[in-house]
Amino acid sequence: MGRRKTTLCLFLAAAFVSLFFLPTDRGATSQTPSAAAPRLTGHGRVGVYLTAYGLLREDILRGVLEARKAGKIDTLVINVKDNHGDVSYASSVPLARALGASTGLLDFRKLIPILRGQGFYLIARQVVFNDPILAKHLGYSNGWVPAADPTAIAYNLAIAEEVATLGFDELQFDYIRYADGGGLASGYEARYTAIDSFLAKVEASIGNKITLSVDLFGRVMWDWNARRTDPIGQSLEDMSAHVDYVSPMLYPSHYTEQKYKDGPYLVVKDAMVSGKKRTSTAIRPFLQVFDMAIPAGMTIDAYIAAEIRAAKDYGADGYLFWEPSNDYRALYRVLGVSYAY
């Protein structure tokens, strides 16, 4: 049944792409991995996040194409390994195959040339240490694997090395942290060291082959993060030293302070001001598009527009939009994209 489902999904993906994307030149349809092409710059990019299944949906593809044609987005962030532990393509990494994590849902060697032909900058999103499949295999009960676990390190490094050959412009690591929980305290230095060590290995292996970026909790931008007391183990200074871009997830709904819950502009402003004092690495934030904890009297459209204004006003090097179900209708309204589901 799994093989039949995968075959159907691949057929639908090919059909949707051929139907809803404009014809490309002959060179763009080559099956040769596009990693051999000149590396594109990631500066100033504006994009949306897509799940592997999002690429198989007609309505989502239509919206993405209309936004690209209108010149409002130029970047796609696509799952290559998600927080279920699933690898979205047919991986050759032995452990991915042994675990049954390799789904073969998407054929990036075919899809990437087509998407590049439409002018998209392509970011591969790899979830790292939140991996229920690997956690179960290694005997961890909470769906997470420690960043210091040798098998977790080797496995994720192997996936990253493989992804670097598929033709993406950039590889972005998400959930590159420990599980949240517990108060701020000393005693987490080993966690910071483990994450820094993993990124150093990645940089040494593929840093000259593909642009690298990391997703960070929004609170990592605050000055107190430099004290290294956060149980998640993310340090802005450490992590930014190994990558080309950092993407703090500046979702107002996730903050505890009411002024930030009610102030989408303020969240982005304060995070950018604080973060730029601590790192010279380009900051390209993720902005909230999902409808959660929107302040009374404010529309989701106004909420999104405020985030965008702050990102522009305070020197973000582009920005990315996050909606977990890939429903970007509100965003398209804000951007002035004429599109209807």
Residue ranges and their predicted role:
Residues 61-86, 165-171, 239-245, 311-318:
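Catalytic domains of carbohydrate-active enzymes, especially glycoside hydrolases
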Residues 49, 121-131, 172, 192-233, ...:
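Aromatic-lined carbohydrate-recognition surfaces of secreted/lumenal glycan-active proteins
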Residues 38-55, 112-113, 123-166, 305-308:
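Active-site-adjacent "subsite" loops/lids of carbohydrate-active enzymes
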Residues 74-80, 103-141, 172, 209:
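Glycine-rich, aromatic-flanked loop segments that form ligand/cofactor-binding clefts
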Residues 243-268, 274, 279-341:
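Substrate-binding cleft of secreted/luminal carbohydrate-active enzymes
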Residues 73-104, 335:
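Aromatic-lined carbohydrate-binding/catalytic grooves of carbohydrate-active enzymes
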Residues 75-83, 144-146, 155-187:
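Active-site groove signature of glycoside hydrolases
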Residues 27-64, 68, 288-290:
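Boundary/entry segment of secreted carbohydrate-active catalytic domains
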